[in-house]
Amino acid sequence: AGCDHSQGIYIYXXGQGNGV
C-alpha cells in the first residue's frame, strides 16, 4: 500500500509526509 504524501502524490512504499 502507499502512504507517502510528502509531495502530494500517493507513492507506493509507505513513509511520512504532509501533502494532498
Swiss-Prot record:
One of its GO terms (cellular component) is nucleus. Mg(2+). Other divalent cations are less effective. Liver. Inhibited by CMP-N-acylneuraminate. One of its GO terms (biological process) is N-acetylneuraminate metabolic process. Its cofactor is Mg(2+). One of its GO terms (molecular function) is N-acylneuraminate cytidylyltransferase activity. Homodimer. This is Putative N-acylneuraminate cytidylyltransferase. It comes from Rattus norvegicus (Rat).
